[in-house]
Amino acid sequence: MIRRHCLMLSSAIVLSIALPAIASSTTPKDQLVLAITMSSMRGLDPHEINQLESAEVVANLYERLIALPAENIAEPKPGLAESWTVSADGKTFTFKIRSGVKFHSGNPLTAKDVEWSLRRLVKLGLAPSTDLRQWGFTAENVEKLIRATDSSTVVVETPEVWNANLILFTLGSFSTSILDSKFLAEKDKGGDMGREYLQTADAGSGPYSLRSWRANELLIADAFKDYWQGEPKMRRVLVRHIPESSAQRLQLEGGDVDVATRLSSTDLAALETGGEIKIQKTPGFGYYYIALNQKDPILSNQKVREAFRYLVDYEGLSSTVMKYYGIKQQTIIPPGLPGALDKNPYKLDVDKAKQLLTEAGYPNGFSKVYYATPVTPEYEVAQSLQANAAKAGIKLDLQGGDHIGKFRNREFEIFSARSGERLPDPHAILQSYATNANNSDEAKLTGLNAWRTAWAVPKEIQDMVTAAAHETDQSKRADLYMKISEAYLASSPPLVTSFQRTDAKAVSSRVKGYLGHSTWLTRWDTVTKD
């Protein structure tokens, strides 16, 4: 089963380093205070958001059919669905909905809410909809395939047979959160199914309800007294926008915040030797990547793509900027999952890059605009690449800022960021990096990094990815993923992966039960404080 392959990447392996004492904390015992960077938060609609910071908030405002506990995310557990069955042909999943669950509005949660929510995700067609659309659900068929048969039963019928765990993992993702359909019907504006309302409000049944959110300032969530698993210990959670690492560190050391989430490697290293702090490092399923737009006649040259792989300072970054934020990984499936290759064939080699550029017809290099997210560690990695590229004759005009929209619309030359695939399975990564069924601009497959990069993925690779997702025999599936890994690496893909994503957080020793989560579902209702 997938479970045995996921142990290395389960959030249970969060690494904690306990350290000596600092000033006494000042945050109230019944409140949790988080320091984050809100610059990428564009709203709180679970069927629209696609960022780590928003996802953690959504994970606590809403519930899902399936629970993926941090201690072992490889084994799906009952959530809003207290039980489920899978038909003999593997295509029909029948979920029994838990009774007694209330939304924050006071409305009871029923199978009709589940039906409406999953249909809404598909019909909105935004980036998170890929999580269901990849299994064959469309706006045209979803009403037939996802249906409530009574007040406590929901049937999810897949058009084709897929590995059952893929469907269950999907229904545990934050994108498949269940919304209060009756309440949102009152908030509908022009048929938007409550989308405008949910930018700054919630309609969930999770352990916390949203009190207020001021963008790039402060979010406040209150414990939900009628939460079906019991009222949380933390009466309130405050999420503060503190973009500077040094400011996060000072407030954590001074006891003004309990958790700091975007610290530089320098500040994390200092905390290792100087404070009463725990450093959590949670390996995830995403990558730090460099995207080379294949619409560009220069960047679409395979030798140019290969040259970029020799301009990343893997070793230097591993010991500095990426010490807390990534694990060197140049192949497409992370360690611990079936199909992972035990090899990292590239190293920083400017002369090799020059040779490849000459063979490609660019002995004097070229100039390109390079967009990078201006947060740690992404920007430091981008600056390193810019310096190494210059040595090979490539002039990169590095521009910080929020350019994710340009990436999604394929309006860029070079772009780098980090991804966070949400299923503990190779398919989650391969779906984004190695499938692109329609490479036209009109296809708008914005949830796929391969489409965003305008890469016409070789048919051989795409066919194997599809076959592996359908395969129910785990041994055969692992063999297929090994072949995919080799073929992907040999193709010199325009998505240059360098480090497996690791999420690093610094947590006050007063805080217990705050657990990093590989799929961004960190829960606040498990938290207590000394």
Give the location of each predicted region.
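Structural transition elements
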Residues: 22, 293, 323, 327-359, ...
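A structural "hinge/loop" feature
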Residues: 38-55, 80, 107, 131, ...
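Gly/Pro-rich hinge or "lid" segments in bacterial periplasmic/extracellular proteins
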Residues: 69-71, 170-232, 236, 351, ...
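N-terminal lobe/hinge region of extracytoplasmic solute-binding protein
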Residues: 35-88, 119, 201-207
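Ligand-site clamp/hinge motif
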Residues: 196, 224-270, 395
